[in-house]
Amino acid sequence: MSTWANLGLQDSASPLMEQLIFFHDHALLILVMITILVGYLMFMLFFNSYINRFLLHGQLIEMIWTILPAIILLFIAMPSLRLLYLLDEINEPSITLKSIGHQWYWSYEYSDFNDIEFDSYMIPTNELSNDGFRLLDVDNRIVLPMNSQIRILVTAADVIHSWTIPALGVKVDGTPGRLNQTNFFINRPGLFYGQCSEICGANHSFMPIVIESVPVNFFIKWIASKVNS
């Protein structure tokens, strides 16, 4: 999901998203180098007046085009596998959030506190404030502390949904009857937008996600106000 005047990925707001961006750039560099090499070989082929005596059989070139791609694939596979394991790791979360997908809104529960749960609906365009984002703003934002390890549990009440925040590098399927989990670490304050990323019916495009990342002391005050209300 792109942001204003952005031709690439969103600015990362978590260490895992930074790693994903580094891997994207790493893989893209390899692809560019392969494209340049193949383009150069094809270009030179048109202007080559030499005749290859080993056109039908050449052991050296066959070894090269077998071993070289295998080495290149290793350079892509190793960082990819490392990232896959990092994304699956849960490191002593400070707080657990449960997200339930419905047609077509999200419900949230703060599992560490009693009776803190709410539904989050998209704000219709005709009710949107001047500084709001069309199809992205919600009536109830998720408030989470920055610089804290956060675990999220995702499920669904009806059909398959997908809870996604691109700036955090998080995408978790919400499957009815199952609990999927992942973790993330927000390293800066701000608003982070996402959307359901699994086609779930007529209003699939109208169930956005908004996270408000705040310092821990502001989060504690917010929790206290919710408990007392």
UniProtKB/Swiss-Prot annotation:
Membrane topology: Multi-pass membrane protein
Residues that bind Cu cation A2: C196, E198, C200, H204
GO CC term (a single one): mitochondrial inner membrane
Protein localization: Mitochondrion inner membrane
Cofactor(s) of this protein: Cu cation
Binding residues annotated for Mg(2+), in chain numbering: E198
Chief subcellular location: mitochondrion
Short name of one Pfam family: COX2
Cofactor binding remark: Binds a dinuclear copper A center per subunit.
Catalytic activity: 4 Fe(II)-[cytochrome c] + O2 + 8 H(+)(in) = 4 Fe(III)-[cytochrome c] + 2 H2O + 4 H(+)(out)
Domain of life: Eukaryota
NCBIfam families recorded: CoxB
Protein name (database record): Cytochrome c oxidase subunit 2
UniProt source species: Drosophila bifasciata (Fruit fly)
